[in-house]
């Protein structure tokens, strides 16, 4: 789809170092968050639930690329 200049694009989220450390630490313990975990993490980091959800989606994709085959349930 061609980008329409009349549409406003959402600004890219710039996470702070502290937010990234907290997100990475949580990712080390679990790659999938429950709704409650996502809400609590978002509130504690002053982020929206959507920002946390998308960060985890992107991080899982990165993890799967770095660890091919490990995400398959055997």
UniProtKB/Swiss-Prot annotation:
- Subcellular location per the Swiss-Prot or TrEMBL entry: Nucleus
Top-rank taxon: Eukaryota
**SMART domains documented for this protein:** HOX (SM00389)
The taxonomy runs: Eukaryota, Metazoa, Ecdysozoa, Arthropoda, Hexapoda
Xref: PROSITE patterns: HOMEOBOX_1 (PS00027), HOMEOBOX_2 (PS50071)
Q: Does the keyword Transmembrane helix apply?
A: no
Swiss-Prot/TrEMBL keywords: Developmental protein, DNA-binding, Homeobox, Nucleus
Task: Provide the Gene Ontology terms for cellular component.
Answer: nucleus
InterPro entries the UniProt entry points to: HD, HD_metazoa, Homeobox_CS, Homeobox_NK-like, Homeodomain-like_sf, HTH_motif
* CDD domains found in the cross-reference section: homeodomain
Organism (species)? Apis mellifera (Honeybee)
Q: Which GO terms describe its molecular function?
A: DNA-binding transcription factor activity, RNA polymerase II-specific; RNA polymerase II cis-regulatory region sequence-specific DNA binding
- Disulfide links within the chain: none
What is the name of the protein in this document? Homeobox protein H40
DNA-binding residues (ranges): 8-67
Main location class = nucleus
Task: Please give a single GO biological process term from the UniProt record.
Answer: cell differentiation
The record's section on SUPFAM superfamilies has: Homeodomain-like
